[in-house]
Amino acid sequence: MRRVITTLIAAAASAALATSVSCTSTSNQPSQGGRPARTADGKPNFNGVWQALNEANWDLQAHEARAGMVTQKGVYDYEYARVPAAPVVALGAAAGVPASLGVVQGDGQIPYKPEAALTKQQNGENWIDRDPELKCYLPGTPRAMYMPYPFAIVQGTDKIHMTFAFSNAGRVIHLNKVEGPPDDTYMGHSVGHWENDTLVVEVTNFNGKNWFDRAGNFHSDALKLVERYSPISPDAIRYDVTIEDPKTFTKPWTISMPLYRRLEANATVLDYPCIEFSEEFMYGHLRKQQLVKHWEGETMNVDITRKIPPGDRLHEWYRR
């Protein structure tokens, strides 16, 4: 039975990190009592492994469940009867999109300029070719904060370090005065300060090559973020982000969600080498014997019955 969403607005470090970060100390254990633990300097203790538990990485806005990130017209000419596009058929239900009430505050809409709204639509229709996540690019801010993977925080008095499972990404929040980077970046340049118990971070210097989610929501190099990290329980943070980009949006807008501390005794951010995993996707058209039916430029048309032929070097690797 088709389920329809009727509600469109959501209710509302001093040391550098290694590629794999383990936070198994008391900082990753449940806080005692109803108040957040504090560091030696009296600030809320954000040390530990954290993760968002929502569907924002699929689409920031409220949406119904659907058969795939990319769909095409089916036998019946109804929007709800669309079927997965050929490249995602073989993934079955794993390629589906879970429903969500959304995380965009206010009216739940993203205020795109008309030309930017068209680009967003085209992004969604060409997700397989365009989404930076599929190519294991650095996920960018704020997307790294709500991807379905854990991330670790190591908190110091002058710096706060974050490391993310996806793409081995990292970012540093500077709490002391620091010059901006010479070049724009995927993750941006973060400068923070404390307002009572809330960590406020301004993020600038983006290269404009990231998306916010798999639905094609995007930004330009004019993006400016103001993040607010506010403890709401011993092991939860309310994460609010005000997004401003005059090249793309008509006005600032805000997303909001909780982030949760991972409470396993051995909670760890492990290496997720997606760069290696995406090599066939990005460079398969250069193979002498391609694994897909054919390529049109860098766009693959997948033959889901294609098997790696015996004798192929990759075939022998899988037999090990």
Q: Model-predicted segments: where are they?
A:
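PEST-like low-complexity, intrinsically disordered acidic/proline/serine-rich tracts
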Residues: R2-R320
